[in-house]
């Protein structure tokens, strides 16, 4: 199918970026608040891995159905429904008893899983092919921006209005963002495509049988594992492992996200103009492995490490472990037809969120079992290292 001329690239970017910021805040806010809130609820802080795991499990499932959702209601309209699902989850978490936290995580996960395939369809329709890396990477800066805002605003809300009111306020913000997108629906909505012909299982089989898509899917699983372990446990590592205050720990998380946002855009430009996105992904896998080893070394042997050293290591982890998403979607858009992008991105996202689900859960349980923060991060480094090797091998065999 020929590519239509781009029409509203910057409006499309603004709308999809706003959506990405809010759903990310909804997903990670619990991780920021866990060290302070979990003990008051009678829950160990490392059990936040279970909450994150439930969210990502539901994101995996909803992402597989995103192609049907785009066909049924439209891509941009689906992002509005995703925001409302996240709003319902945050409000439920804020108003309900402890038993409702996992259902709240499920609602947030459903919304989060719909966003990437839907926003990819919107951007792919409006963005010139020569600038995919820049636009997709800029949209994906919504993830570190969302994490940074959560790191800044959640502790502030905790001490001013309490964590429950803060969660409800975040839900209200999601609803307001869904309403703000409404005036742009007619201008941004891509033409409707027929519903995907294959079911979820067949779609996964299709992706798995394609060598390039299989390598990319496994890389996304590995990179998401690393990313979510970093985002979920950095505050706890600094607060509980290195003795930092919660405010200082969350503040470093926020600053690291600013660095990762800049890195995402830079990697996207590199993928557009100098290196193939595939090669950029290989390099990111290698560097995120080195960064995780450095973070683990700090946690293992240097409790009194200077602030500058800890900050530099955290920035390196954030830039690499959180800098891959935009380049990944740009590479995916190069490999699949425009009309197949929502369903194929939903299928590869199944692996991405599988890493997001398993990583925090396994890491949290390993810490509880006595592995400690340092050795946990050293072990995580093996995951992106193997993914980089597999991507390079698949690239040579094409």
Regions found by a protein language model. Give the residues of each.
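A late C-terminal transmembrane helix in Major Facilitator Superfamily
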Residues: 335-370
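C-terminal transmembrane helical hairpin of 12-TM major facilitator-type secondary transporters
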Residues: 277-328
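Juxtamembrane intracellular "pre-TM" segments in multi-pass secondary transporters
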Residues: 2-6, 188-217
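Helix-loop-helix hairpin linking two adjacent transmembrane segments in secondary transporters
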Residues: 139-186
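Cytoplasmic membrane-interface "Motif A"-like loop-to-helix N-cap segments
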Residues: 72-82, 273-287
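Conserved MFS/SLC helix-loop-helix module at the cytosolic interface between two early adjacent transmembrane helices
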Residues: 61-98
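Extracytoplasmic gate region of multi-pass secondary transporters
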Residues: 30-31, 212-257
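Cytoplasmic helix-loop-helix junction between adjacent transmembrane helices
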Residues: 105-143
């Amino acid at each position: 199918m020929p590519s239509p001329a781009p029409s509203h690239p910057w409006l499309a970017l603004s709308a999809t970026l706003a959506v990405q910021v809010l759903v990310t805040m909804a997903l990670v806010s619990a991780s920021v608040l866990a060290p302070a809130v979990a003990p008051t609820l009678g829950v160990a802080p490392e059990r936040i891995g279970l909450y994150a795991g439930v969210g990502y499990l539901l994101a995996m499932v909803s992402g597989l159905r995103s192609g049907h959702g785009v066909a049924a209601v439209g891509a941009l309209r689906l992002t509005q429904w995703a925001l409302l699902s996240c709003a319902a989850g945050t409000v439920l978490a804020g108003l309900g008893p402890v038993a409702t936290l996992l259902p709240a995580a499920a609602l947030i996960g459903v919304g989060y899983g719909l966003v990437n395939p839907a926003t990819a369809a919107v951007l792919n329709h409006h963005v010139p092919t020569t600038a995919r890396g820049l636009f997709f990477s800029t949209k994906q800066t919504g993830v570190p921006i969302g994490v940074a805002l959560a790191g800044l605003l959640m502790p502030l809300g905790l001490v001013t209005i309490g964590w429950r009111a803060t969660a409800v306020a975040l839900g209200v913000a999601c609803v307001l963002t869904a309403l703000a997108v409404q005036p742009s629906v007619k201008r941004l909505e891509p033409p409707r495509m027929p519903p995907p012909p294959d079911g979820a299982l067949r779609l996964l089989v299709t992706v798995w049988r394609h060598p390039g898509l299989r390598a990319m899917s496994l890389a996304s699983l590995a990179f998401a594992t690393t990313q979510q372990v970093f985002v979920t446990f950095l505050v706890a590592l600094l607060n509980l492992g290195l003795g930092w205050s919660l405010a200082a720990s969350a503040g470093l998380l926020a600053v690291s996200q600013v660095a990762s946002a800049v890195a995402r855009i830079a990697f996207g430009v590199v993928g557009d103009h100098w290196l193939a996105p595939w090669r950029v992904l290989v390099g990111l896998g290698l560097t995120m492995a080195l960064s995780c080893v450095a973070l683990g070394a700090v946690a293992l042997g240097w409790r009194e490490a200077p602030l500058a050293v800890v900050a530099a290591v955290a920035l390196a982890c954030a830039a690499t472990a959180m800098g891959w998403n935009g380049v990944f979607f740009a590479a995916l858009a190069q490999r699949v037809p425009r009309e197949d992008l929502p369903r194929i991105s939903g299928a590869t996202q199944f692996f991405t969120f599988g890493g997001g689900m398993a990583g925090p859960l396994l890491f949290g349980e390993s810490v509880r079992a006595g592995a400690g923060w340092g050795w946990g991060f050293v072990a995580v480094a093996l995951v992106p290292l193997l993914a980089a090797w597999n991507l390079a091998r698949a690239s040579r065999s094409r």
